[in-house]
Swiss-Prot record:
Family of the protein in this entry: Belongs to the ClpX chaperone family.
Protein name, per record: ATP-dependent Clp protease ATP-binding subunit ClpX
GO molecular function ontology, one term from the record: protein dimerization activity
PROSITE patterns for this protein: CLPX_ZB (PS51902)
Record function comment: ATP-dependent specificity component of the Clp protease. It directs the protease to specific substrates. Can perform chaperone functions in the absence of ClpP.
Gene name, Swiss-Prot/TrEMBL: clpX
Residues annotated for Zn(2+) binding in this entry: 15, 18, 37, 40
Source species: Burkholderia thailandensis (strain ATCC 700388 / DSM 13276 / CCUG 48851 / CIP 106301 / E264)
InterPro entries for this protein: AAA+_ATPase, ATP-dep_Clp_protease_ClpX, ATPase_AAA_core, Clp_ATPase_C, Clp_protease_ATP-bd_su_ClpX, ClpX_bact, P-loop_NTPase, Znf_CppX_C4
Xref: NCBIfam families: clpX, PRK05342.1
Binding site for ATP: 122-129
Residue ranges of coiled coil: none
GO biological process terms, semicolon-separated: cell division; proteolysis involved in protein catabolic process
Example of a GO cellular component annotation carried by this entry: HslUV protease complex
């Protein structure tokens, strides 16, 4: 765009792309007879990032150097603490799944079946984080669905095909990419049928949803309305083949240990039986002995269990594991809060006794790793409220008394220490 002259006779410069003047933008960068503003540069960067990410999905799955199970496990270790056996099972299953996809075009007498995954473990043990980390590592579209919100088609609530619509939305409605994505269905245990006998009455949010999910997990052509649209009989639908989508289902399965224990105690009778008291066997150890018949007894239909051949169990996180979760992963909570405080030019120190107190509190609440953030947030609330208006604070120290609510954070000023909230 040509330069225009202002009223004060000096040249006013304009962006050659959007036409905004130099006074309407933060920065105007000059080239040979053209100018570009900071807003247009940001927009160009965003377009390039989106296209690079889209190209990366295809590239990541077409490369011969698909991460090995060991490499997948190593990356999971950076984000997820503990659950070693579950990480190994997941690494092998995901590697085999995407290796299978790479060889789909090759003609062979042996057809490789898809191996979907079932994660069993208590709340806050890392089920969702494992699935999220896998999707990030493989650079494929990913969506989390809550099984408790699903109903059979035709009833009030979300039908199962909405899951595929969300997956499409996450990859800008590019069907090829969606067909190689990962779907994580959480709370799968909450749609178990009420008894292990087939239901006579209609169960639209339990067994009925399992039947609907069965087709999706097994592989079907899902009909999804166009971008931003709702289902209508007279409109064209986008057809998505779910055959090559990896489904990971997760749930706490509260009460499954009792089902397993009842079965194993019946079989473990006689002179050669190994006797262990209930106190000696923790829930994680019991869950590792899960069999398909236990899941059927719990309330999952046999057909759905058959479509989830890879079962990984996660144990309850103990105090030591929770303390590691607070500090060791790449995006550990303590590192996040230290970064927040660093933005105020203040150093945050959370002492080991405070970390231990946070872990103990999470165990008491039975929230696992999921409850750690709320405990720290509650402990730091007052100091985060006051800090932006306080002058000269260089460091904040948190001990176990702060976590338990019996004390206040210690503020270190450039001159002398002071307790938060004191005058």
């Amino acid at each position: 765009m040509a330069d225009k002259k202002g009223s004060n006779s000096e040249k006013l410069l304009y962006c050659s792309f959007c036409g905004k003047s130099q006074h309407e933008v933060k920065k105007l960068i000059a080239g040979p007879s053209v100018f570009i503003c900071d807003e247009c540069i940001d927009l160009c960067n965003e377009i390039i990032r989106d296209e690079a990410a889209a190209a990366g999905v295809e590239a990541s799955l077409s490369k011969s150097d698909l991460p090995s199970p060991q490499e997948i496990r190593d990356i999971l270790d950076q984000y997820v603490i503990g659950q070693e056996r579950a990480k190994k099972i997941l690494a092998v299953a995901v590697y085999n799944h995407y290796k299978r996809l790479k060889h789909l075009d090759k003609k062979d007498d042996v057809e490789l079946s898809k191996s979907n995954i079932l994660l069993i473990g208590p709340t806050g043990s890392g089920k969702t984080l494992l699935a999220q980390t896998l999707a990030r590592l493989l650079n494929v579209p990913f969506v989390i669905a809550d099984a408790t919100t699903l109903t059979e088609a035709g009833y009030v609530g979300e039908d199962v095909e909405n899951i595929i619509q969300k997956l499409l939305q996450n990859c800008n409605y590019e069907v090829d990419k969606a067909q190689r994505g990962i779907v994580y269905i959480d709370e799968i245990d909450k749609i178990s049928r009420k008894s292990d006998n087939p239901s006579i009455t209609r169960d639209v949010s339990g067994e009925g949803v399992q039947q609907a999910l069965l087709k999706l997990v097994e592989g079907t052509m899902a009909s999804v309305p166009p971008q931003g649209g709702r289902k209508h009989p007279n409109q064209d639908f986008i057809q998505v083949d779910t055959t090559n989508i990896l489904f990971i289902c997760g749930g706490a399965f509260d009460g499954l240990e009792k089902v397993i224990t009842d079965r194993t105690e019946k079989t473990g009778i006689g002179f050669g039986a190994t006797v262990k008291s209930k106190q000696e066997r923790d829930a994680g150890e019991v869950l590792r002995e899960v069999e398909p018949e236990d899941l059927i007894k719990f309330g999952l239909i046999p057909e759905l269990i058959g479509r989830l051949p890879v079962v990984a169990t996660l144990g309850k996180l103990d105090e030591a594991a929770l303390m590691k979760i607070l500090v060791e992963p790449k995006n550990a909570l303590v590192k996040q809060y230290q970064k927040l405080f660093a933005m105020e030019r203040v150093e945050l120190e959370i002492r080991p006794d405070a970390l231990q107190a946070v872990a103990r509190k999470a165990i008491r609440r039975k929230t696992g790793a999921r409850g750690l953030r709320s405990i720290i947030e509650q402990a730091l609330l007052d100091v985060m409220y006051e800090l932006p208006t306080l002058k000269g604070v260089s460091k904040v120290i948190i001990d176990d008394n702060v976590i338990e609510g019996d004390g206040k954070p210690l503020l270190i000023y450039e001159d002398t220490p002071k307790v938060a909230g004191s005058n």
